[in-house]
A protein has these predicted regions:
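Post-transcriptional modification and biogenesis factors for structured RNAs
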Residues: 2-185
Length: 185
């Protein structure tokens, strides 16, 4: 196990910041947004989201229990070599995670959302929580969020849900777009 994986498992954050050089340009941005995956189940989805967060300078929060270990081969493969550029925090449960974001605007992303994700004005201080792939966010979390902060990504009638990593990408890029893609692109 690599050192940064041990730190993540122990609930610590790991952030490797690098800068541009004449020969090589690597990722470096101040973290902008926070994404929470509540009890994620499928390792490749989380791996893709790790890569997405590294590329958009978003912080990723995972709420236990997880449906995999952080050494899972599929998770590591999907994230390619971006794991070292992501800021990841593992929370023991929802109460701990919720406390961490007390006082900030929390958006629950759900097929049950009443507000379309693209009809909301976002700030870099906003937090976005996504539920597990097989069942979505529990009523406890949905009920704790103001109705206008329960957002959805539209789909054609009869569709059940989007892939988790796709839904995170759609929402995160809208949030970043609204900020004017505030980091260098």
């Amino acid at each position: 196990m690599r050192r940064d994986e041990r730190q993540i498992q122990e609930g610590m954050k790991t952030r490797i910041s690098c800068c541009s050089t004449q020969d090589v340009t690597v990722l470096h941005c101040a973290p902008m947004f926070d994404v929470i995956l509540y009890q994620p189940e499928i390792p490749p989805n989380t791996g893709n989201i790790i890569r997405l967060c590294a590329n958009t300078s978003a912080r990723l929060h995972l709420v236990k229990p997880l449906g995999f270990t952080l050494e899972d081969k599929q998770l590591l493969r999907a994230g390619l070599d971006y794991h070292e550029f992501a800021t990841i925090t593992v929370h023991e449960g929802w109460a701990e995670c919720e406390e961490r974001f007390k006082g900030r605007r929390l958006f629950a992303v759900s097929t049950k959302g009443t507000q379309r994700y693209d009809q909301v004005g976002y700030t870099s201080d906003d937090v976005f929580v996504f539920g597990p792939e097989s069942r979505g966010l529990p009523a406890e979390i949905l009920g704790s969020v103001a109705t206008q902060q329960c957002i959805r990504v539209p789909m054609v009638p009869g569709s059940r849900s989007l892939n988790l990593s796709n839904a995170v990408a759609v929402v995160l890029y809208e949030v970043w777009r609204q900020s004017g893609f505030s980091q260098k692109v």
